[in-house]
Curated annotation (Swiss-Prot):
Modification N6,N6-dimethyllysine occurs at: K561
Subcellular location: Cytoplasm; Melanosome; Nucleus, Nucleolus; Cell membrane
EC number: 3.6.4.10
Residue numbers binding ADP: T14, Y15, G202, E268, K271, S275, G339
Binding site for ATP: 12-15, 71, 202-204, 268-275, 339-342
Protein's UniProt keywords contain Ubl conjugation: yes
Gly residues bias (residue ranges): 616-632
Family stated for the protein in its record: Belongs to the heat shock protein 70 family.
Gene3D superfamilies: 1.20.1270.10, 3.30.30.30, 3.30.420.40, Actin, Chain A, domain 4, Substrate Binding Domain Of DNAk, Chain A, domain 1
Name the record gives this protein: Heat shock cognate 71 kDa protein
Residue segments, region Substrate-binding domain (SBD): 394-509
Amino acid sequence: MSKGPAVGIDLGTTYSCVGVFQHGKVEIIANDQGNRTTPSYVAFTDTERLIGDAAKNQVAMNPTNTVFDAKRLIGRRFDDAVVQSDMKHWPFMVVNDAGRPKVQVEYKGETKSFYPEEVSSMVLAKMKEIAEAYLGKTVTNAVVTVPAYFNDSQRQATKDAGTIAGLNVLRIINEPTAAAIAYGLDKKVGAERNVLIFDLGGGTFDVSILTIEDGIFEVKSTAGDTHLGGEDFDNRMVNHFIAEFKRKHKKDISENKRAVRRLRTACERAKRTLSSSTQASIEIDSLYEGIDFYTSITRARFEELNADLFRGTLDPVEKALRDAKLDKSQIHDIVLVGGSTRIPKIQKLLQDFFNGKELNKSINPDEAVAYGAAVQAAILSGDKSENVQDLLLLDVTPLSLGIETAGGVMTVLIKRNTTIPTKQTQTFTTYSDNQPGVLIQVYEGERAMTKDNNLLGKFELTGIPPAPRGVPQIEVTFDIDANGILNVSAVDKSTGKENKITITNDKGRLSKEDIERMVQEAEKYKAEDEKQRDKVSSKNSLESYAFNMKATVEDEKLQGKINDEDKQKILDKCNEIINWLDKNQTAEKEEFEHQQKELEKVCNPIITKLYQSAGGMPGGMPGGFPGGGAPPSGGASSGPTIEEVD
């Protein structure tokens, strides 16, 4: 077959979708069943492996060997809390293989286990086939989407799944970003518009705010809940009917996997019906112990069962607005993505929240992400049509990134919600005299102290030529590429010696829950953090004052300008303070300030006398006038040996 165009694939938790940009527009491709979305399901039987509709259709007969939700496992460790809690709800087995989760199934009469990447690769391979059948050409290049909060390890694992499926993954892009691209092509606008994307799918919920101006997209903020979606609404209905069955027939079907599966399938169908009708009926023959289950549910009851979940979708909306520093009145467009946004109650809650504003439903919510991915695939593979030409895409980093400086302080180089790709450089210095190396520790998180943040990696820069503290200049650079991969490097300016690290760690960067939790905790702890920051700052200012003062009076330029008695007085007091500091690293802010006042009492009169006699200092004092000191950031000897410079 000849080589086909690049495709866009929305690899969803519950459903996937594939699109292609050709003849100047996006076409969403239907599968062999005529469906434009395909279940992200893989089933193993005695005779074959089924993927998509075929797998989902036989799930009731073969629940333990039908795998879905691989996206919830991908790029995570087995002991990840998310994996542990999800396992309780899955009919298939998840086993621990050297810290990584694998799904275990019976296939052709033997026990097999697969990594999540392998399961996802089967779904991706299916999407590739669907595209090839439609195009009549081989498809290799693809853009694959992931939730905005997927961390590095999850993105990498998704990319690996593509490789396993025989795809060349041009880029991993965020789902909301993809939806924004779909939206951007539909609505070309000149003036800047703020767009809120509300993506409630089968398994995940993402809210993103973007600005679109002259074909340029910028993600301003993202928020959400990795564990909210259509399946949760199904679960509420399933539990409701299990309880009803108990009441009517005095029997508990909850332990019977097949009965629960059949009930779930009926509930999912009823839910869809309730988006267009106010009532749905459920008829299951011989559900349990030969009992037929015929019942019905109203839209109002469905809404009541899910009231807290539906209302809860507004929390991330408020959070995204806060993070983007926007008021809800400043949002120009609200875009619905994901099948669950068809639920009338959710549309109403959202519309009411935005004071009756019209919602944008012009894009089929199930297809918007694949649509945008297809456009991005065309751009990356060099499509020259004008619809695509002037479109540029900017993503953001979900957490602040920085390094630890003296005293365990988190010094941020890249703030959260910074547009990527991005590069930031800052110069640091040594903390003690003749220090031969520095340890660069890279952290992500929003807290003031690194101990409260997440360590991503560390490396040493050695071979710094002997020099007094504060003299060497070490330039640290953080560089994030378009795929969100972080490179950190450090260079000693005097020798040109360099060392660097690429952060792609398996142990998983933070999950979305962690990020959410950290941001919430950060707000809660902000006050504590400020207090700690002030404390370290007053300690550092005292420390640099003492060291600078000592260096000043020992400077040979002052020979003969200062009498020995005064000089000794200052040195004694400085040494006393330095000794006190060594013993009192964790003192309170007030104590540091008190010690500094005591030291100034001794030094100020002598220094003033010097100034008057000399008419200004010859050649300027080393390290600036004492008390100017280094910026507040010197610190605990226990901290790493690196210090921030202005």
